[in-house]
Amino acid sequence: VFSRILRENAEKIGFTDSFTIYEPSDCKNLLKTIVRELNLPDEKYKPNVLSSRISYAKNCLVTPGAYLANSTCAAEDRQAQIPDNIYCQRCKRNGAMDFDDLLLQTNILLRDCPDVLARYQEQFQYILVDEYQDTNYAQYTIIRRLSQTHSKVCVVGDDAQSIYSFR
């Protein structure tokens, strides 16, 4: 659903409707390339670690600019933030989004474009979320935005199946 919403409104967030969705392997390959181009040590800047960090930030709705401006994040390894930022810039330049961008960009679109939000609030008067125990903050925020007008949301979940029980 979010991919369709983004394709229908891609120009409002600086993409074309033919944007590519990167697979996890594409993301890791891009990160490897960036680390190599920056001459960073492979053993310290592992694509899996960088990818997880980028994913976590996007799922918390933290954009690269906000991440760099955050004082808590600034206390972390500043050098690791450089490949993160370049990764996001390259994805945009390549007309691509990763799976986490689908959530982040949908949130940005609905937050910044009230006309788009109103349209989808009318279209999705009833919202059913299955496997709710596996939703993250970005997904919750989209659901909350879309349901503001009609407040007709049904969520189904099983805490015994939660993939986030370790958090």
Report the location of each language-model feature.
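A basic/glycine-biased coupling hinge at the interface between accessory DNA-binding modules
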Residues: V1-Y126, H150-S151, I163
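Conserved helicase motor core of SF1/SF2 NTP-dependent helicases
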Residues: V129, Q133-R167
